[in-house]
Amino acid sequence: MVFNLENEKDKKVLALSNFLIDNNILDHNELNSLIERIESIYFNKYIEEKVFLFAITISRPLTIDIWNALYEGFNELNEGFKADNESFKLTITFKENEPFFKSKNSFSSVTIAIIKDYFHSFFSKDKKYKILIEQELSNPNFLSYENDELKAQCQTKELTEWLVQKSKSFIFWMNNAGFKNFNFIALYPIDKNESKLKVKAVTVSQYDKQFETKVFATEFIPIHKINQQIDDVKIIGQIFELKTHESLTGKKTLNIYVTDFQLGGSLILKWSYTDEKKIEGITIGNWIKAHIQVERDPNTQILYGIVREINPVEIPNNYKRLDLSKQKRVELVFHTKMTAFDGINDIEEYAQFAKERGWKAITVTDKDNIHIYPKFYEVAKKYDLKAIYGLEFNLTDDHIKIVHNPDNTKLSDATFVIFDIETTGLHGRYDDVIEFSARKIKNNSEIDHQQFFLKIDKPIPKTITEITKITDEMLEGGIDQQQGLEKIRNYLDDCVMVAHNGINFDLPFLQTQFEKYNIKPLTNPLIDTLCLSWALNPLFSSHTLSNICSKLKLEFDDERLHRAEYDTEALKKVFFYFKKQLKEMGINTLTEIDQNLNKKCQIDLMKRVFTNTAIVYVKNQRGFQNLYEMLSIALTDHNANRPLVLASSLAKFRKSFLLTENPVQGDIFKAALTKPINELEKAIEKVDFVLISQPNAYLGYTLREGLKKELINDAIKLVIKTATKLKKLVAVASDAYFIHPWENEYYKAIVCAKGLGGKWHRHFNNKEKEQTVPEVFLHTTDEMLKRMSFLGEDIAYKLVVENTNKIVKLLDLNELVPTKNKLYPPVMQDSNQKLIDKTWKQAEKRYGKNLPKLIKERIEKELNAIISNGFGIVFWISHLLVEQSVKDGYFVGPRGSIGSSLIANLIGISEINPLAAHYLCEQCHYFEVSDSVDDGYDLMIRDCPKCHEKASFKGDGHNIPFATFMGFSGDKIPDIDLNFSSEYQAKAHDYVRKLFGVNNTFRAGTIATVAEKTAYGYARNYFEIIKRVDLATTAEIERFKQKLIGIKRTTGQHPGGIMIFPSDHSVYEFTPCGFPADDVESEWKTTHFEYDALGDAILKLDILGQDDPTMLKHLADLTKINPQNIPHFDKNLISMFSSNKPLNLKPGIVDEVTGAVGIPEFGTKFVRKILEQTKPKDFADLIRVSGLSHGKNVWADNAQKLIKSNRLTLRDVIACRDDIMLYLINKGMQAKDAFEIMEKVRKGIKVNAKEVSLMQNCGVEQYWINACLKINYLFPKAHAAAYVLMAWRIAWFKLYHPLSYYACLLSFKLKEHDINGFEKGYEFIKNRLDELNKLYRIKKIKPKEAELLTSYEVYLEMMARNIKLQQISIQNSNARMFVEHNGVLIAPFITIPGMGEAVASSIVEARNEKPFASLNDFKKRTKITKKHVETMEQLQLFDEFEHQDDHKLFN
C-alpha cells in the first residue's frame, strides 16, 4: 500500500504499522491484509462521521508496555481520522489455542508475570491504594491462578473490599487483553464469624454479547442515553458550567457540566487535577470529548461521570448548522429574550450565529417593546452586521365592531334571526357546516324556527363529535352542502342577524362557504353578542355563552352545550336580556349600539378585541422618533391589559415604516384559512409586503385546531398566489423565538410557565396540561430552502433569498442610530451663573475673603470642568433638592463619588470635604494643611493659633481627588446620587417634577427578568408537566435554568432614578415611554430604555430613599441635637467600632466584641469581623474598612491575608479606588498614569506588563502590585467617607443617647421583632440567637430569621446596657415608632403579628380623638380584625381595660 506522507492520517497509519511489525504483533503479510480490508462500514448519526473498521488478530502474549503503546498508537491514529471528521473502530481477536488466551488449568510463570504487570497497571491508578498494591505484589504468594480462578490473598479487609468493588472493571479489562473465562477472587484472613469475600466474574460469553470486543472503539454514546452505571464510556458534549471544589488538603476537583442538548442529556463530570495547565481549553462553551466512568451518587441516585481523559474537540457537524448557500437569506422576524415569556436568546448569541454563517444583516422584531434597540445597535456594530429595527405589535381598528354593517334600523322594529352553526372545524376554506339552527324574533316573540343537518363527504372528525355530540349517522338524513347553504342564505337574508362571536367566526365561515358554492354573500346587519357582552359586562372574566347565562342567572344546561339547536335557545334569552339593558341606556338603533358603546366602553372593548399581529420596520432615522411616539401611545393611552396600536395611530406615522404582518399570527394567513378571497385581498392590500413562514411554523394550527399539514401548504400557496396577483412582494421568515432546533425544550419550559397575571402562553392548554409548540427556530438559508421545496426550487429561492434581500434594500440601514450619544441637559435660567455665585459666596463664608491658593485653584479647576462640559445644571438641581429637603427638616446623605467635588461640598450637596486634611478656624478662617494625619477628622480640636479662640480650630478634609468623580479631564457625566429620608423621597421626586414639568420628568425604567430561583422553578415545573421528573437531574436543571435566566417578565422603575428631558426637545427623540409593569394607574411614566442606554444623552438624578437619614432626623427631634454639630474627633467613639468597652456593658450577656451592632454599614457580621481583625485606630481607618467591605476581591484573599500574614496595617493596603491614584502619585508617578491604572484596577481590568513595569520603576512594593491584580471592583473613597460620616453620627447617639438611639433603631432598621421574647428574658433570647447563628453558619437561615437574628443581637446589647423594652400599651404605644415612656421603650402597634400600618394608625387616630372607654369602643373605632383581636388577647394587651361584659369582642 502506498502512503502519502503529506497526509497526517497516512503518516499515523504508517507509524502504527511499523509499531505492529517492530513488536512482532503482525508480520508484513498480515499488515497488508489488514490495511486492504479497511473500509467504510457505517455512518454514525450522532457525530455525523464515517467510521472505519480495523481488525487485527493477536497470536502471542503482549506485555503491558506494548499493550499501552498499542492503545496510545490507536488513539493517535484516531486524532488523524478526527481531523477529517472521520472515526474508526478497532476489533481485536485472540487466538484461543494458546494457553495465554484460554486457560485450561494454570498459566506459565511468564504468563503469571505478565498478569502481575496488568494487575499492577490497573489497580495502582488509584493513589490511595497504590502503595498497598505494590506491597502486596512483592509477596510471591499474593496472586495465584488455578481452576480458572485468579486469587488475590490480601492482608487487610479494606483492600479486599476495594478489590471486590473494582473487580468487574478489572475482569472486563483483562478479557479485552485476551484473558478469557476466568474468575477473580479477593481473599483475606478471616475469623470464624466472617465469611469470605468473593466476586464471580461475568463470563466472557456474556461480556462478548454486551461489549463485543471493542477495546478501543471510538464511537460516542449520546449523553441522554446514559441511564445506568457504566465502567467505561466515551461521550462528546458542550460545557455549559464549571464549578471548582477544593478540599482541605488542596486537592481540586472540577465539576464539568456537559450536554448533548437532548432532553435529559446533561451530566456532571468530576475531574480531579493538580496541574492548572491541564484545564486549558476546558472552558464554558467549548465542546469536549471525554473518556469517563459513570457512577451513581448514593444519596441523590443521580448519575455522574468520573473523568479518565478529557480533551477539547471541534463542534460535531450536526451541531454546526452551516449555511453553504452562496447568497444568504435575511431573517425578517426574530424575537429575543426581551419578548416577554416568549423569546430565549440574547442579541449577542443571535449576532454571533449570523456572523459565523456569513449573514450580512439581522432583524429584531420583539413583541410590544424595543428594549433591545440600544444593545442591538452596539452588537450589530461589533459584528459588522446591518441592523434591521422592527417591532411586532397588536394592531386594531379604532372602532371595534359590535354590529357588522350597522344601519338606523330601530331595535323595536327589527326582525332578528338568532342563529348558530356547527362545523367540522374552525377554517371556512377547508371545513364544512354540519348543523344550522335559527330562531326568528319579532316584538320579543319567536315567530319561526329552523334546524337541519348538512351532509358531508367525509367522516366527522372525532374531536368535533366529542364536542357537539353530532355523529355521522345523524348527518345521513341531512341536506347536501349546496342546497343547505342556499337555504341558510335565504333564511338569514333581510333580517338583523344575531350570533355569538358571529363577526369573527359564524359570518366569515358562511361567507367563505357561499363563495365556494357560488352563492351570493350576505350584506345584512349582524349583532355580535360576544362583543356586546364585552361592552355591557366588563367585569365578567369570561364571555362564553354558558358563563354569561350563569352570571345573569339565566337557565342553561351545560350538557346540551355546543349544539346549534340548544345554543340558539340560550342565546335568545341572553339577547332579550341585552336588549333590555340597551333600552335602559337609551340605545335604540343598530348604529347607536355600535357608536355609543364604542365611545362609552372603548377600553373595555380594547381589553377583549381580537387583534392583528403586525410588524413595522424603521425605514430611516426619522422613523425612530415616530416609532417611539407610536409605541408610547400604545403603552400608555391605549394600554388595555396589553399595548394596542390603533389604525389611526399607525396611519399617522406610516411613512416612516415598512409594514407587514406576522406570517403565522397575522390576519393574512388567518384570512387564507377562514375568509373569502376578497377579505384576503383586503388584508394583503394593507401591507407593503407579505411574509409567510415554513410549514412547520404553522403546526399550532394542526395541534390546536386540527388543520391538516397538507392544507397548511395549500393556504401558503393561496397567500403567495393572491399577493402575486396584487403585485405584492412575498418573502419567507422563520418567525423565530430561538436560534437552534435543540433549544425547543427551553422554549417549551417557558410555554409551560404561568405568565404575569396568571396568564397562560398561547401554545399551552392548561386544562389538558399540553403544549402545542410549532417549529420556530432560526433557519439557515439551506434549511429554509429545504422547508420551502414544496413550492418548487425556483419559487422557493425567490421567496427565501431574493425577496428577503430586496426588502432589505428598501430600508436605509447605513445611518440608523436608535439613541443619542451627546448630552442634552435640561435648561434652567441662569443656573450656571447661580452655581458660580453660590460657590464663591460659600467659599468666602467658610474660608474668608482671601481664599487660600489651594482652595481657589481647586474651585477654579472644578468650575471650569463643570461649566465647560454643560454639567452646571446637574449641580444646581442637586443643590435645590438638598436645600429644599433641609428646609423641610430632613437631612440628605450623598453617596457615590460626588464627595470628590469641593463645589458639591460648598453648595451643600455633599458633606464630604475632599481637600487634604486641614485645620480651619470657625472665627477668623485661619486655614492650615496638616500632613500629620490621613484624614482631617483625626485632627484634635485645638485653640486657634492665630485668633486664640478656644476650641475653634477644627479638622476637616478627606483627601479625595476630583478626577475620581468626573474623570481626569473633567468631562465625565456626573452621576449624583442623593440619599433622602425614605419619608421624604416622594416629596423630592415631586419637587423635581414641579421644577421641570410632567412632560419632561420620567422615572428611569428597568426591565424585570426571570431570576435564578424563578428559572429553577420553571425548569422543575416543565419536567413535572411532561411527566419526566426522572430526567430532572442537577445538571439538566442547571442547563435549563441558565437559559431561562434573563428572559423578560415585565417592566419596572429605578427606586430613585429620575430622568430629566430638555424642554426644547421631545422625549420621543430619545426613547419611548410607558408605565412601570404596565400599571396605567401609576403616577409616573417610565423611560422605555434603561438608564444605561440613555446615560450619555439625558440627565439622571438618583433621588434614593434610605432609613439612615430618617433615623438621623428622628434622633435630632428626640434629643434636640443637630447631627451636624457632632464633633469630628472622639477617641471613645473610634474605640467603640472595635471594642464594646465604651458601652459599659454588664458582663456575661453579649458575646460580640465590637460596639458596632446596629451601626449602619458596620453592623453586619461580615464588617464586624473586619473591624475585629483590623482594629481601626482613627476615622481614616473607618473609611478604609468601608472601602474594603464594599469592594470585590479587595478584602478576602487580598487585604485580609496581607494584614494577617505580612503584619501590615489598614494604612498599608488598598481599600478604596482613590488610594491607588494618591499612592502612585506619592511614589512619583505622573498623575495621568496613576489615574489610568486606578481606573483599570477599580473596574477589575488587569493592568498590563507595561503598567506593572511603570509601578516597579516607581518603587511600588510587589505585594501592592499583586493586590492590584486580584481586585475586581474598588469602592470610591468619597462614597466610603459618606457612609462613615452617617455611621459616625448614629454611633455617637448610640454612645451618648442610648434610649433615643434604640428607639430609632428598633423603629427604622429592625424589620422583625419578638417583644414577647424580650420580656421572657436573657436565657430565651440567648438560646434563640444561638439557634439562628447555627443556621446562619450552615447557610440555611431564612430571610425572616436573618432579620430576627439581628434583632436578638440588639436585644442582648440593650439588656447589657440596662435598657428595658415593654410590650405594646393600648394607651401609650405609637402606630409604628418605639417610644420612650418613663425611661422604658414601648413597642408600637405595628409589631403585632399581621398588623399593617393602616390598622395601627387607626388605633392611634381613634385614641387621639378620645380615650377608649371599653373594648367594644376600641373595636368600633378602629380597623382591627378578629384575627388581630385574638393575637392581642394572647399577648394580654387588653388587660389594662376593666373586665366588662363586652370583653369578648367577637362572639
UniProtKB/Swiss-Prot annotation:
The keyword Aminoacyl-tRNA synthetase does not apply. GO terms for cellular component: cytoplasm. Disulfide bonds: none annotated. Its EC number is 2.7.7.7. Residues 416-575 form the Exonuclease domain. It is found in: Cytoplasm. The keyword Cytoplasm applies. GO terms for biological process: DNA-templated DNA replication. Keywords: Cytoplasm, DNA replication, DNA-directed DNA polymerase, Exonuclease, Hydrolase, Nuclease, Nucleotidyltransferase, Transferase. It is an enzyme of class 2 (transferase). It catalyses: DNA(n) + a 2'-deoxyribonucleoside 5'-triphosphate = DNA(n+1) + diphosphate. GO terms for molecular function: 3'-5' exonuclease activity; DNA binding; DNA-directed DNA polymerase activity. NCBIfam families: dnaq, polC_Gram_pos, PRK00448.1. Belongs to the DNA polymerase type-C family. PolC subfamily. Required for replicative DNA synthesis. This DNA polymerase also exhibits 3' to 5' exonuclease activity. This is DNA polymerase III PolC-type.
